[in-house]
A protein has these predicted regions:
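Active-site rim elements
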Residues: 74-77, 206-213, 259-263
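Pan-zinc metallopeptidase signature
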Residues: 225-323, 327-329, 338, 347, ...
Length: 413
């Protein structure tokens, strides 16, 4: 019952696809220029067909290696931060993962999607989705996958920081990639997914929709992705704006899957874990630009007292925006940490980091004594090298006015 709405939507979109195959006057999006927008999001121009403009107001895209577009259409209930997050997740999934079995070069996956005019349709809610398809959107000759604003918090917004809403963006965007990128180009991956899914069923995985077994490996991968990035270690409070009813401890997705973290997937579902590792980066590759009104400290280091850090621990590249005084704490992956025009305190927290304070009076934090570091000034940066191994690493500082050591604070030009 929990997935009846998703099942209805799947049937509706499949019906739309079948109807399009019968048409000879298919409608498509024109080329939309986003180069004039700082964040790549624009208001839909008048050149866009009316069946699109009567539902959507915003647009962005990713350009595949073949020069064609993968599209995003958004309704008015989506903030631009949310739209950027959806685009970031798509970019992450399509970023090549050198040395991996299925993700070493994802050019073919992205090209296949753009050839099929793959499009994320970002609705406010399910009612708006049904209204749009019943009102003419079915005539748009694009391969579409829905995502709703009430299931897609943006990194750093209030919902994300309080860990309120289940983030469905990874799963739903995966479905678009799977249907129009993976199926046409990765037959070996599809076979491996099916084997892993079948073994997981024997262990208790309850796939949905129950009467569509051909879709079970696709849904299974969506569940694996969520757990690989630890989105369910702390269960969300809301699921599509409805109170979430938890399943048994250690499970996710209303108890339908028997593991709730990357570590548990590795031990309880090794075949599924192996498939994920063959395509997905172990960390999130996109630059997360925090909301302009963000205040406080955003941490990329796991802190079990802060539920959001189970998600943020896989980020490596974060940018503060706006002018509020705010702080960043990195992790041990080697980060790109960028401040805003306010006063920022930035701690790399391990690994070799690129730290840019931006405007304002900014400080970089190191946990050791000042005489345990070597400081080298370059023309456009200051290099701080920790002489103790496995601690602060080697950080490159730019637009940083102060360095905070455990024993003193020094000023740098």
């Amino acid at each position: 019952m929990k997935y009846s709405i998703s099942t209805l939507i799947t049937v509706l979109i499949l019906f739309v696809a079948c109807q399009k195959n019968l048409r000879s006057d298919n409608i498509t999006l024109p080329d939309i220029d986003i180069s004039g927008s700082a964040n790549g999001i624009v208001t839909l121009p008048q050149t866009v067909p009316s069946i699109v403009r009567k539902t959507f107001v915003k647009y962005t895209k990713l350009i595949a290696p073949n020069g064609k577009s993968i599209h995003f259409l958004a309704q008015d209930g989506w903030t631009e931060d949310q739209i950027m997050h959806a685009r970031n997740v798509m970019q992450h999934i399509l970023t090549s993962y050198p040395g991996s079995t299925y993700g070493n070069d994802k050019t073919g996956v992205a090209n296949s999607m753009s050839d099929k005019r793959a499009t994320m349709v970002l609705f406010n809610d399910t009612d708006e989705l049904e209204k749009a398809f019943n009102g003419g959107l079915a005539d748009l000759d694009h391969s579409m996958q829905d995502l709703r604003s009430n299931e897609s918090p943006a990194v750093g917004d209030e919902d994300y920081m309080a860990h309120v809403t289940r983030d469905a963006s990874y799963e739903e965007i995966w479905h678009l990639v799977h249907d129009y990128g993976i199926i046409p180009t990765r037959p070996d991956m599809i076979r491996e997914m099916r084997v892993a899914n079948d073994v997981a069923v024997e262990k208790g995985w309850r796939a949905w929709p129950q009467d569509e077994p051909q879709e079970h490996p696709n849904e299974y991968m969506g569940v694996l992705i969520d757990n690989y990035y630890d989105l369910w270690v702390i269960e969300p409070k809301l699921y599509e704006a409805q109170d979430y009813e938890p399943g048994p401890d250690g499970t996710t997705h209303f108890g339908s899957y028997f593991a709730n973290s990357r570590a548990h997937v590795e031990t309880k579902d090794p075949l599924g874990y192996t498939v994920i590792e063959k395509f997905f980066h172990p960390y999130l590759t996109f630059n997360a630009q925090l909301p302009t009104d963000f205040k406080g400290t955003f941490s990329l280091s796991l802190d079990k007292s802060q539920a959001y850090t189970y998600k943020s621990q896989y980020l490596i590249d974060v940018t503060l925006r706006g002018s509020n005084n705010a702080n960043l704490r990195g992790n041990r992956l080697g980060n790109n940490l960028t401040g805003n025009s306010g006063n920022n305190i930035i701690h790399g927290a391990g690994g070799d980091d690129e730290i840019d304070g931006g405007g304002g009076d900014d400080g970089a934090v190191f946990i050791g004594l000042s005489d345990e570091y070597e400081i080298t000034k370059q023309e456009d940066a200051t290099i701080v090298s920790d002489v103790q191994s496995d601690r602060d690493g080697i950080d490159r500082l730019s637009n940083i006015e102060f360095i905070h050591f455990s024993d003193k604070k020094i000023e740098i030009n």
